[in-house]
Amino acid sequence: MYYGFDIGGTKIALGVFDSTRRLQWEKRVPTPHTSYSAFLDAVCELVAEADQRFGVKGSVGIGIPGMPETEDGTLYAANVPAASGKPLRADLSARLDRDVRLDNDANCFALSEAWDDEFTQYPLVMGLILGTGVGGGLVLNGKPITGQSYITGEFGHMRLPVDALTLMGFDFPLRRCGCGQMGCIENYLSGRGFAWLYQHYYDQSLQAPEIIALWEQGDEQAHAHVERYLDLLAVCLGNILTIVDPDLLVIGGGLSNFTAITTQLAERLPRHLLPVARAPRIERARHGDAGGMRGAAFLHLTD
């Protein structure tokens, strides 16, 4: 059995998957905020419960925001203060007497989608998250590509390309990102960015769902806004896809629920790619809230 943990600032979620990659059981508990020992106990107790329930010693994978293992072997995860700065992988491997694998939660999202029954036919899968921020991951032949700093797939911190300024206007404001840089595409393509663009051009403060509702009602202003957003997304993705050249692009996050993104993006991409390039198949993520647990569990699939 494959045990996958999706750990965030508020909850520790465990999903148990069988050899056919089907979810057999799941359980969630609150994330301890201050005590590292309480945090370790919470994870170990869930593993012990799963071992007893299924009569096996399952493999353990964990998806967690941040950098799963720094140079000194410790976790960096600002949203999980009880475990940040601690040697989480080593400590859990020792306590559970098995190889515990950690990866970034965005990489686990991409891995979950790459192991979808239909998507396993694609060697190179790119996951793109358009949510509170912009992120994602890359999976090659069923294995995540992590890089030395676990930042592979941090697409949101690429800068706006010059073609974006041609589209938006050269007086378009370059916003300061939370990472400290200027002009990161996360500030324009995330759910927050979607709403900010609307306010910038129309001087109206609406949230993304409200704008999308107007678009669905045929509102001309919302329609123009969505067209501009999709053109900007295509411009930025053109650079990324030229570097990565994936077979499949899976889009997740809150904005993936807006069907225009997956249905209208493909027709905009070719003008931003090399003439010989083929745009990837574009699909909406299929596994929702279970994706983090799935991807973490599947860190052990390709041994």
Curated annotation (Swiss-Prot):
- Residues where ATP binds: 4-11, 133-140
What InterPro entries does this protein map onto? Answer: ATPase_NBD, N-acetyl-D-glucosamine_kinase, ROK, ROK_cs
GO molecular-function terms, A-Z: ATP binding; N-acetylglucosamine kinase activity; zinc ion binding
Q: Which residues form the signal peptide?
A: none
Q: Output the CDD domains linked to this UniProt entry.
A: ASKHA_NBD_ROK_NAGK
- For the protein in the UniProt heading, the enzyme class is transferase
Gene3D superfamilies, from UniProt?
A: 3.30.420.40
Q: Which reaction does it catalyse?
A: N-acetyl-D-glucosamine + ATP = N-acetyl-D-glucosamine 6-phosphate + ADP + H(+)
Query: Where does this protein hold Zn(2+)?
Result: 157, 177, 179, 184
Name the UniProt key words of this record, in alphabetical order. ATP-binding, Carbohydrate metabolism, Kinase, Metal-binding, Nucleotide-binding, Transferase, Zinc
Give its E.C. classification number: 2.7.1.59
State the Pfam families in the record. ROK
Q: In which pathway does it act?
A: Cell wall biogenesis; peptidoglycan recycling
Biological process (GO) annotations held by this record are: N-acetylglucosamine metabolic process; peptidoglycan turnover
Which function does this protein serve? Catalyzes the phosphorylation of N-acetyl-D-glucosamine (GlcNAc) derived from cell-wall degradation, yielding GlcNAc-6-P.
State the similarity comment: Belongs to the ROK (NagC/XylR) family. NagK subfamily.
Q: What is this protein called?
A: N-acetyl-D-glucosamine kinase
Report the source organism. Salmonella schwarzengrund (strain CVM19633)
